[in-house]
Amino acid sequence: MNELVIFNKIKWLISYSDKYVFNSFTKVHINLKIRYQDRLYFLLENCIRSNTNIGNIRVKYQKEMLIDISLIDYYIGEAYDKKIIKKNRFSSVINSLNEIRKMTYSWSIINEEKK
């Protein structure tokens, strides 16, 4: 599992968020933090699930990954708009999310071609 590049990127994003993003949230915005944090872990879970399954089940979890990425993108955008996180941290998260999104799209296209 550690050889999967997407998995490693997601682990890096969770680690980065633990160090730099989660600490920025105040008690007023704790709900946004919890949703962001949950979606990160759902993304990791769906990556593992899609890697261990095959066929239509794999496609389902890959689509779930894309949904998780979109929601994480929305939540981090809200945090930036509310000035909870700094621009450089926002950029790091968005760049990482874009890499994960592109890899997930490519992975799903490869699976579609194998059918």
Indicate where each model-derived feature is located.
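Amphipathic alpha-helical assembly/interaction segments
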Residues: 1-115
